[in-house]
Structures are given as C-alpha cells and as structure tokens.
Amino acid sequence: MMVQRLGPISPPASQVSTACKQISPSLPRAVNAANLNRPPSDTRSVILQESLVSTTLSLTESQSALSVKQEWSQSYRAFPSLSSSHSSQNGTDLGDLLSLPPGTPVSGNSVSNSLPPYLFGMENSHSPYPSPRHSATRAHSTRSKKRALSLSPLSDGIGIDFNTIIRTSPTSLVAYINGPRASPANLSPQSEVYGHFLGVRGSCIPQSCAVASGQKGILVASGGHTLPGYGEDGTLEYERMQQLEHGGLQPGPVNNMVLQPGLPGQDGQTANMLKTERLEEFPASALDLPSALPLPLPPPQGPPPPYHAHPHLHHPELLPHTQSLSLAQTGLEEDGEMEDSGGKHCCRWIDCSALYDQQEELVRHIEKVHIDQRKGEDFTCFWTGCPRRYKPFNARYKLLIHMRVHSGEKPNKCTFEGCKKAFSRLENLKIHLRSHTGEKPYLCQHPGCQKAFSNSSDRAKHQRTHLDTKPYACQIPGCTKRYTDPSSLRKHVKAHSSREQQARKKLRSSTELHPDLLTDCLAVQPLQPATSPGDAADHTVGHSPGPGPGPGPGAELYSAPIFASNHSTRSGTAAGAGPPPHPVSHPSPGHNVQGSPHNPSSQLPPLTAVDAGAERFAPPTPSPHHISPGRVPAPPSLLQRAQAPHSQQPPGSLLKPYQPETNSSFQPNGIHVHGFYGQLQTFCPPHYPDSQRTVPPSGSCSMVPSFEDCLVPTSMGQAGFDVFHRAFSTHSGITVYDLPSASSSLFGESLRSGPEDPTFLQLSAVDRCPSQLSSVYTEG
C-alpha cells in the first residue's frame, strides 16, 4: 500500500502545543512537534491505537491539503477538554488524534465518524460524548470510492507501516462499521469502503435498511454465543474473526465493549441505553472465563455480522431467548415438516401434517381419517413420496398393510427369546421364524435335486438354474454371462470393475518408458567383426597412442566401411580397414598430395565413373536419421579427398590397406580441426542382398581411412581453415560453421590418457568434452 505524503502543511510547533493544550489541559506531558510522548494505556496496546489512527485516516476521501487543514482547525476549537486516557499514542504534526472524542470526523469526507469508545482505551464509559450522534453533523459523507488514500495531515511524518498495523490488528476496521448511520443526517450508502481491507468486497459494510423493530442490535464482547437472527454465514464469519483477534485484543474492562451503536428505536431507546442495561448483567469475574465456557445469556464477542445478516437482526427483547443456530435448523426436512423426533410422528398424507406422540395414534389416524373416509372402492395410497405413484390396491387390507411401511408400524414381532426383530408383514415373520427352527419347506421341484429352502423366492432362484433361465444378463460389452438373481449379477459386475482396474494398471506400466530403456536405445552398440582371416590377428596392435610408421598387422576389419577411432590423434598411426563388402563408386585413385584439399594450389579432379559393366551404387546422402551425437556421416568421396595421399592403384584392382603418409614434409600443410563435433566413426550404407555382398568389387575402389588420421596435429593459421572450409563446402555440399574453440589439441592431448576398448566403437571427443565444440558439419 502506498501512502501519499502531503506538502509542508504542518503548522509551527507553537501552534501544535497551543492547540493540544486547548483540547486537553490535563495531559500528563507537554506535546512538542518533534516527539510526542506516549502515556501508557491500561486497556489497549500501542499498536492497536496506532492502527486506529492510520486506518481511519486512510479510508477518507482524497481532498486538498487546504481543506484538510481548515477542517482540523475548526475541530480544534469545537472540542472541550478530555481525560488523560484519551491522550496521544502517535506523534504527529497537528497534535493528537486520540485526544478527540470517539466518533469525531477527521475530514470533510470522513467515512467513519463513530469509533467505539473501547478501542480508545476509555476506562470511563460516561464520556462527555457517549454517542457519535453529537459529531455526526460535521461528517458530510459522500459516496466514497474504494481504496481512498489518506490525505490527512497526520499521514505526513508519522512513518507508519500500514501493512504491519493491519496484519497486527486484523479486526481494527471491523469494529466501527455502521458509524455514519448514527443520525438521520448520515444515511448515505457506504458500500465497499472497508472491503479492500477485509478481503471480502463490501461484505461488512451494511447499507441503511429499515428493520421492523426500528432498533439495530448490538454486540457485547463476552462468550462465544450468537445473537438470534445473525444467520449461518454470520456465525462462520464471527468464529473466523474471533480466531484472528484472539491475540490482538486484550481482555479489558467491560465498560467499553459496545461495538455497534444503533438508530433510535420507536420506544425512544438508544444504543447507549441498551449498552448500559446489558453491561449490568455481566460481572467482571464472568468476563475472565474462556470464551468456550457457556454463560447464562452471553451475546457474542467480536465484530458485527456481515452485510447479509444485518436485515435479520431482532428486537432487543428477544436477546434472553438466544439459542444455537444449529438447533433451530435441525429436524427440518426439505418439505419443511418435522421428522419423527422427540416422540413425534408426522402424517404425510396429502394435505395433512398431523403430529402424534405415539405411533399407534398415527396408525389409527391413517386408518380412520384417510382410508375409511374414501368413497367407493378407491384403495390408493396418497402418501407423499410413495413409490407406487398412486397405483390403487384391489382390497382394503392390502392398503392397510402397505401403510405400515409409511407409518413404521411393525406388529409382527419375533417370539424367540433374545430376538428383537419385528416385521410389518406376517409372511416375513414366518420366514424369519424358519431361520430359528431350521425348517425348509420349499423343496426344489427339479428331478434329482434335493435342495430345500426356507422361502419360495430362494427356491425360484434356484430352479432357474436348472431351467437355464437366467434373466439377469451382464450388460458389459463382450460379456455373455447371465445370472438367475440380481445379487449374483452385482457381484459379477464388481469383479468386472476390479479386472478392468488391474488391466489399466498393467497397460499404464507397459506404456510408460523406463529411463533405462531409453538409455539402452541410445547406447552405441559394438559392430560385429567380419569373418575373415584377418580376425585372427593380434587385436592389441594399432591401439597404442604413440606414432608409428605403418599400420598394425592386426587392424580390425568390420563388416561395413567405418572410420575407426582410437581417441588419440597420432601422426602416422594407421587404422586398417578391409575392402568394402559392396562396390562403391569412388573418385579416381590418381589423387596425390597436390590433389587433396591440404594443398590449395591444385584443383581437385572430377569424380570418375565406375566401369560400365559394374553396378553403380552412389554413396548414400547423409540424412538426419544417420546423425547421432557421436557419429556424423559423410560421403566416402569427400573423406577420400581430405585424407593423406596414398599410392596409385590401377583401376579394377583391390587396394591394399591404407598407408597414411608419415612424411614430415607434409605436416606443415596438415589441418587440425579444433573440437570436430564427433569423429566420423561409422557410415551407414544401404542394405543390399547377401548375393551382392559376395560379389567381388569391380572398378576403382578404395577403402576410406579414419578421418582423424588425416587430421595431423599441427599449428595453422586462419588462412588454412578458410581454404579447408571452402574446399570442403564446394565439393561436398556440406556447410562448415565455425564456433569458438576452447582447446587447441582436442584429439591429441585431451584424450590421450583415456582407456580404449578394441571391441567397442569409442565415442568421439565431444562425448567427453562437450564444451570444446568448434565446428559443426551439417548438410548443405
């Protein structure tokens, strides 16, 4: 909440002191403009009085500073001296607000001109102004707006935290709600004045309304009972407010506990008279009891009821007849008739609501008045809510027996000792007696069945099982079960529901993907080595991080052309690979050092066609389906151009395992890509039949080496990267994006100490160092 500050409208300190002395000469201490002393109060705390000052002023209508100053100047001259108990609790620029009598308006647009005296800590209830009616004429109330900010001079320089005060004393505003209605001059509506503080919009701001008695009720702080006519919502509101103010309002004297003054009644009584009469009934010792203890005639303690409960206030002489609201509502049913309670039995025949103390009297009344008085052969039940829906009986005795259901008469009582059951029909009693005697006179009539039953209905159910007559069929789709009695059908339906719940649980558990399943799907699976004589070679050769002059004799051969990764950038270390399982079109093997993108001085020759008789299989275009965080596919032709030069082979002959160039003269022109996003580890070729896989390759064919083998670790400038990017993008259609690099030797140094597993494809360096990403290769 924002508090607006006025300009310099405060009078000098001498005027403040003079005004305060004129208002209250008996003040115990002198009032100065800088720091007003706070005399102790025996009845209320300082915080509560501060809240009264601040919240009262914050509810006034906005007006100019001049009008506020003039209004307060007039108020000073009008008030006589008060007792010291009315003295200030807050130092202000214009004196003490609490020196004013309760109920005095503080501005021309004041919306609260009747403050209860107990909130000011008044020990003497016989104040010079016992009623706010004396000062009500100066409160020219208008239709106030919601959340009006205070423009009174007291808001300047006080430094009061309104939020803290309102939270400390949540019911300080509720105490003086109906003030402006204290005289006929102030009957203007005041809706939504305090609603923004109370949390309920306009719930506690009653409008001026006429009451039949002409007298408004009052509230006296005492026990936890409710005045009659307050309504259920009023009781709930009162209990809630009482909990809030349990620690805020101290148990003070009885003299200051009238919260709501009233209009003058028809008999000339005023709220002040009622206050004096009610206070005489409560001694001081009774008020010290907890609120939970019931008092003889205790009106409720706390704030007045909400707005919707005010029109239901009763005359003051009804106060001794207070009773609990729940008791007034109990026993009433929807039709407004009293149920059988306290020995009363009600007749619900149409247009009849007779009450009887004894059940026999009600039965006699139904028979003599409602059945025997019917003319002709009309034996229809007209009981309210009867399920027969006015279907007549064909005999009088049947109607009488039926009426026992409504009246509750059960004349047929069990004669066995200890059994207290009674029945309205004699047949039901006979069936019950068979349960005591064990008699089962109803035998199954189906040949060969010896079952017997105590009643005919059970026998009929059993006989339907023999006749295969099962009228009670299951209505669930897909179920063809039928039953002879409805009870069995109900059990079956319950079993259906339990089975459906179990099925839903199983389906839910099966559809939910476990995190481990997703991890297993994304895991890199090892490639199975091809069955070739080279598999018997030593698997330990070729994995050493140190450089070597040639390929290891035991280089692994895989079933598809792959780019082996050993997680170590080496100068001259070879990763051997076997021939591809199917013919793949490659560029002419006439490439040399000058024909590779490592040397920008020469031009790359175009791709050469494979032999005319050979099947043409173009390398698959990289697609998003082949891209994974650890693998970035690329055409073999591109990688062959980017690799180190190798010896020329005649077309149509198989190439030997790749021999990387280890000449040191080549290294200055080598390219080292920082943080290449995943080494190109595997290439996913299209699936071909096994027959094509066994065909020996024809035409020019070469095995693509590992891409990291051609990335020799060396230093190069930005020009070398530009040349490589241009050559890479021009001939492959793959765009190269440069990103900031975090390391200069990703392949060589960061992963040199990592463990190696010859049976698995190792993930790239990005898997371990994701922050060192420098180049991302995407499709052009």
Curated annotation (Swiss-Prot):
One of its GO terms (cellular component) is nucleus. It comes from Mus musculus (Mouse). Residues 497-512 have a biased composition (Basic and acidic residues). One of its GO terms (biological process) is negative regulation of transcription by RNA polymerase II. Pfam families: zf-C2H2, zf-C2H2_15. InterPro entries: GLI-like, Znf-C2H2_ZIC1-5/GLI1-3-like, Znf_C2H2_sf, Znf_C2H2_type. This is Zinc finger protein GLIS3. Keywords: Activator, DNA-binding, Metal-binding, Nucleus, Repeat, Repressor, Transcription, Transcription regulation, Zinc, Zinc-finger. It comes from the Eukaryota.
